[in-house]
Amino acid sequence: MEKEAVLTVSDLSLYYSKKKALNTINMTFYKNEITALIGPSGCGKSTLLRSINRMNDLIPTVTITGAIDYKGKNIYSPKVDTVDLRKEIGMVFQQPNPFPFSIYENVVYGLRLKGVKDKALLDEVVENSLKAANIWDEVKDILHSSALGLSGGQQQRVCIARILAVNPEIILMDEPTSALDPISAARVEETMLELKKDYTIAIVTHSMQQASRISDRTAFMLDGNLIEYNDTKSIFLNPEKQETSDYISGKFG
């Protein structure tokens, strides 16, 4: 059965001032899959990820050509509201970034911005989001304690719950486990595998093991170019490009 495309990147190039950081990228992200972006530092993988919900717009020197099509529209169209876009395409960062509020208020933050005041609804969203983020059992008795008192791995899962509360379609993750200990990282990986049943996920990772464990497709990037994009098994066991093989085998990176 053919997979449903959720988002398509077409001829995307990005410049920081005159420096080209992405060079004519073409790729498609598919529904209910995890796509891993791999490559050495500075290859453009985080820049590509941030392009998908227009986080690069916040950098004054950036210019972008090409298109990213989502729900039949180019997200770079002037008609697209970036606030609405980022509700549908949420992002989890490398360092957990909970707000200095209670766990409960972190999760409902986006709903409160939308004017939701129904306590029963907020309670339900908090429980469902924390369960989906694989952390409910750890925090259900301390919901009104500060999220800053949690471990790094717990904070990262609360940040995931905060995104889930506004019901996104796509979740972007920029090295979400690199600042975590191995046990915490494994819990976040478990969470991602559960979440892909309901969401589409794109992750930047420096860990070949992580990419091979959790992703359905892998894109290898080098010097702003998309070198190879295929199902993860093919990328790791039978890469078509020599650069991909060299990177995966540790010859550079």
Swiss-Prot record:
Subcellular location: Cell membrane
Ligand binding (ATP): 39-46
PROSITE patterns: ABC_TRANSPORTER_1 (PS00211), ABC_TRANSPORTER_2 (PS50893), PSTB (PS51238)
Coiled coil: none
EC numbers, comma separated: 7.3.2.1
Stated family: Belongs to the ABC transporter superfamily. Phosphate importer (TC 3.A.1.7) family.
Name of this chain's protein: Phosphate import ATP-binding protein PstB 1
Organism: Lactococcus lactis subsp. lactis (strain IL1403)
Taxonomic lineage: Bacteria, Bacillati, Bacillota, Bacilli, Lactobacillales
Gene that specifies this protein: pstB1
